[in-house]
From Swiss-Prot:
Keywords: Cytoplasm, Metal-binding, NAD, Transferase, Zinc. 2 residues (Tyr-53 and Arg-56) present in a large hydrophobic pocket are probably involved in substrate specificity. They are important for desuccinylation activity, but dispensable for deacetylation activity. This is NAD-dependent protein deacylase. NAD(+) binds at residues 8-28, 86-89, 177-179, 203-205, 221. Substrate binds at residues 53, 56. HAMAP family: Sirtuin_ClassIII (MF_01121). The keyword Hydrolase does not apply.
Length: 237
């Protein structure tokens, strides 16, 4: 049996991964997300964009995978499982999943905004949250930026290609913790259904996918995923 997992913000929320509006220190809540997550915002103030992403980078580095992440990693030891995520954290990887196809980039990867070469050098320290941080500079003179898909940017070719390939050939797709409204990722469950796959939605709240999903489970990732593989035969009867 081949399984694809499509994960969204809900699974990471259980690990207390902060969102934009979760800013406890008050530095970022006053900014429009577009100012910090777009090429226009980057061009206007790269130091502020770096401050925002470096703050998130270090916050996420200090949280841990939850039972949902660990369950998915355990599945990979038993059956063929492809992990596709809209999240920019590394919690799937730290739980043991591999490979993980990041559709929206990663807080833990960086590249030059000018020549696109990957950056593996040191990051600025952030012992306390600050509003602006000088970006590292590439050998070509360009500024290093987070490898995140910003507003208006296309998805990275390779992760998207692999996500589509896995979706087209899967037997079961588990859609966990995603609102199912952000395209093109929201189109993957539709593609799976069109190819005859079973689509299982795991979300405490209904989403636009609910009416079309084969099965909808109104639980969180940590509640539903640890026992889901064993429950599949009964669920699919």
């Amino acid at each position: 049996m081949r399984v694809v997992v499509l994960s969204g913000a809900g699974i990471s929320a259980e690990s207390d991964v902060p969102t934009f509006r979760d800013d406890k220190n008050g530095l970022w809540a006053r900014f429009d997300p577009y100012q910090l997550s777009s090429t226009q915002g980057w061009q206007r103030n790269p130091e502020r964009v770096w401050g925002w992403y470096l703050w998130r980078h270090y916050l996420v580095a200090n949280v841990k995978p939850n039972d949902g992440h660990r369950a998915i990693a355990a599945w990979q030891e038993q059956i063929e499982v492809s992990v596709i995520t809209q999240n920019v954290d590394d919690l799937h990887e730290r739980a043991g999943s591999t490979p993980v196809h990041h559709l929206h980039g990663s807080l833990f990867k960086f590249h030059c905004a000018r020549c696109n070469v990957a950056y593996t050098g040191a990051l600025p320290d952030m012992p306390e949250p600050v509003l602006e941080v000088d970006p590292p500079v590439c050998y070509c003179g360009g500024l290093i930026r987070p490898a995140i898909v910003w507003f208006g940017e296309p998805l990275p070719d390779e992760p998207w290609r692999r996500a589509v390939e896995a979706t087209e050939t899967t037997d079961v797709m588990v859609v966990v913790g995603t609102s199912a409204i952000v395209y093109p990722a929201a189109g993957l469950p539709e593609l799976a259904l069109s190819r005859g796959a079973v689509v299982i939605e795991v979300n405490p709240e209904p989403t636009p996918l609910t009416k079309n999903a084969t099965i909808s489970i109104r639980e969180t990732a940590s509640q539903a995923l640890p026992g889901l593989l064993q429950r599949l035969p009964a669920l699919l009867k």
